[in-house]
């Protein structure tokens, strides 16, 4: 015989059921999402030798592509490129458009909204001058009459604001545009990491001096990822970055794609 429930008991049961229904389901972690979909989505920026796309096939190549493909292989999933820019790649991570982004400097502003693993490698910051323009220190560029091109939304702009805040900045969407600004005389110089600077100099013989301004700027480059409570992906990427650096795989990949881009004039003091 079923016992009768008192009105108080009925109310209590209903309240408990409502409370359970109100508890949101736990958000799926990025790691679990990648495993479920079988896809690791990565941001691909038009910035050789990190990433560059074959105009005929549409296929992305570059050392950062090879790195992501190795990460995907270790995870047992497929690497899927998602075209982005330096100005939008952090937003793409936040909005779940991509799962990771190679080639990011961990600036304080970025660290407020995303997490990082690494460093994956380290980079010097170079300037490539217009022919006829001479400069060798950051102070030489730190003048209002000196126009310096840099990529919009990139760490190049952040660094330029620190080392040459008085320079007149010419902010453009990609490295090809910054190089064109210098060769055309719209800018006196361009500033970017050594990899992009080497490729730009090789592809544009009309560019002038390739300069490592002093004091030297040498910064680590990280893998950016979405901020979340579950840090499984972050821990995995941290281990992956350390392992590949210790065994020399990272430097070998970078030099391989510099060579394929024809940028063989790497200064002896440059290490990645």
PLM region spans:
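Extracytoplasmic small-molecule ligand-binding "clamshell" domains
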Residues: 27-104, 112, 257
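Ligand-binding clefts/hinges and TM-proximal coupling segments of bilobed small-molecule sensing domains
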Residues: 29, 155-172, 209, 241-272
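Periplasmic-binding protein-like
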Residues: 46, 122-129, 198-241, 260-272
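Ligand-binding cleft/hinge of the Venus flytrap
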Residues: 51-56, 68-78, 138-142, 156-173, ...
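Short helix-initiation/N-cap motifs at beta->coil->alpha
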Residues: 65, 80-91, 135, 170-180, ...
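Extended ligand-binding regions for polar small-molecule ligands
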Residues: 65-74, 133, 139, 154, ...
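A ligand-binding cleft/hinge motif common to bilobed small-molecule-binding domains
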Residues: 88, 104-113, 159-162, 188-217
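Flexible hinge/capping segments at coil-to-helix
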Residues: 129-147
């Amino acid at each position: 015989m079923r016992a009768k429930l008192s009105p108080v008991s009925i109310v209590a049961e209903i309240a408990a059921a409502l409370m359970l229904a109100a508890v949101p389901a736990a958000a799926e972690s990025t790691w679990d999402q990648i495993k479920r979909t079988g896809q690791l989505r990565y941001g691909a920026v038009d910035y050789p030798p990190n990433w560059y796309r074959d105009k005929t096939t549409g296929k992305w190549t570059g050392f950062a592509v090879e790195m992501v493909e190795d990460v995907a292989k270790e995870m047992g999933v497929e690497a899927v490129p998602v075209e982005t820019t330096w100005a939008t790649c952090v937003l793409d991570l936040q909005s779940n458009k991509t799962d990771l982004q190679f080639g990011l400097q961990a600036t304080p502003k970025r660290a407020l909204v995303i997490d990082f693993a690494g460093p994956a490698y380290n980079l010097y910051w170079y300037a490539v001058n217009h022919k006829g323009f001479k400069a060798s220190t950051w102070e030489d560029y730190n003048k209002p009459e000196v126009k310096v091109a840099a990529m919009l939304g990139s760490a190049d702009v952040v660094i330029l604001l620190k080392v040459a805040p008085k320079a007149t900045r010419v902010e453009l969407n990609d490295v090809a545009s910054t190089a064109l600004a210098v060769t055309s005389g719209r800018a006196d110089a361009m500033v970017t990491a050594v990899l992009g600077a080497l490729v730009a100099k090789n592809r544009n013989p009309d560019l002038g001096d390739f300069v490592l301004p002093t004091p030297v700027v040498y910064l680590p480059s990280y893998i950016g990822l979405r901020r979340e409570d579950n840090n499984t992906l972050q821990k995995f990427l941290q281990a992956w970055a350390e392992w590949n650096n210790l065994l020399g795989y990272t430097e070998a990949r970078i030099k391989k794609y510099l060579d394929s881009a024809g940028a063989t004039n790497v200064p002896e003091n440059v290490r990645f």
